[in-house]
Swiss-Prot record:
It comes from the Bacteria. GO terms for biological process: lipid A biosynthetic process; lipopolysaccharide core region biosynthetic process. Its EC number is 2.7.1.130. This is Tetraacyldisaccharide 4'-kinase. The gene is lpxK. GO terms for cellular component: plasma membrane. SUPFAM superfamilies: P-loop containing nucleoside triphosphate hydrolases. InterPro entries: LpxK (IPR003758), P-loop_NTPase (IPR027417).
Length: 335
């Protein structure tokens, strides 16, 4: 319901306006005061001894940050740099912090997004609610540039480049601050970032257009790859910020969909729940982010759909040029 109020002007939103508006004003005052305290030095912030690139957004919910992080890490690796990734590990609880992710780390300990990033890139990934501690853990792993997954509003960590990801379809909803609207910060905050990446929809003049390019479906048990259109009677599920985006992608791939089930972002799943869901079709298909949480109890007819961020070559070059410019003062040449 909150999504409908934020993005679709549901009538209930007008009824709740008098109740929620004061809290949005308070949220804005606290947010601005907190940021100013970091900017003036009244609150301490950590300056890492190597470049920090933040990938985040100004709205609550999923905007496509993780594919951008994966693309950025792979791009840095291809340039010869040694990137490490910092994440808060939303929705997870590790035995201790900081946690450096490895092949055996369960998603329940590190979070679905850090696990996905590690599996896709093999770059060092450190999880800690205090991101400066995660950075310090990565320094022991020979990295020479830090990429933070989310954290645009985590001003306790100083940064060299800011990349904001925007949902090109939903944009900023009613353009109100939480809880009346989806905004973590005012839209004007985007005037200060280095790059605005627009996921889907139509990018504006100062934005970089991104599309998510799907590949073949991958079997969770065997790793077999298969065109989505060849899988019969698919039951689709998605525990992401905008499930309908995933379902629309499947339709564009001519998927034989018999049922679509959306879940909350970062939803925890169990075998019984998904076995029951899978009975509604011949195959169960999910996002790659969901797959990292379901691999331990996956069945032979469960699949996931990987997607990769794609940009126009000139847009990629703009980002690469900025990274190289920022790396120089740190004396962090590529390996």
């Amino acid at each position: 319901m909150i999504e409908k109020i934020w993005f679709h002007r549901h009538p209930l939103g007008y009824l709740l306006w008098p109740l929620l508006w004061p809290f949005s004003v308070l949220f804005g005052v606290i947010s601005r005061s907190r940021r100013k305290a970091y900017q003036t030095g009244d609150k301490p912030s950590y300056r890492a001894p190597l470049p920090v690139v933040v990938v985040g957004n100004i709205t609550a919910g999923g905007n496509g940050k993780t594919p951008v992080v994966v693309w950025l890490v792979e791009t840095l690796q291809n340039l010869g740099y040694r990137p490490g990734v910092v994440s808060r590990g939303y929705g997870a609880k590790a035995p201790s912090y900081p946690l450096v992710v490895n092949e055996q780390t369960p998603a329940q300990h590190c979070g679905d997004e850090p696990k996905l990033i590690f599996q896709r890139t093999k770059a060092p990934v450190a999880v800690d609610p205090v991101r400066s501690q995660a950075v310090k853990a990565l320094l022991e792993h020979g990295v020479n540039v830090i990429v933070t997954d989310d954290g645009l509003q985590h001003y306790a960590l100083q940064r060299d480049i800011e990349i904001a990801v925007v949902d090109g379809v939903r944009r900023f909803g009613n353009q109100e601050l939480i809880p009346l609207g989806p905004l973590r910060e005012p839209v004007s905050r985007l005037d200060e970032v280095d790059f605005i990446i627009t996921n889907g929809g139509v990018a504006k003049a100062n934005e970089i257009a991104m599309r998510l390019q799907p590949t073949d479906a991958v079997n969770l048990k065997t790793g077999e790859r298969c065109a989505v259109s060849k899988l019969t009677r698919l039951c689709a599920m998605a525990g992401i910020g905008h499930p309908s985006r995933f379902f629309n992608t499947l339709r564009e791939l001519n998927a034989d969909l018999v049922h679509c089930q959306g879940f909350a972002d970062h939803q925890a799943f169990d075998a019984a729940q998904l076995n029951q869901l899978a009975q509604q079709g011949d195959h169960l298909i999910m996002t790659e982010k969901d797959a990292v949480k379901c691999a331990e109890f996956a069945q032979p007819n469960w699949w996931y759909l990987p997607v990769s961020a794609q940009f126009a070559p000139e847009a990629e070059q703009r980002i690469v040029d900025k990274i190289k410019e920022v790396m120089e003062p740190y004396g962090s040449p590529s390996a």
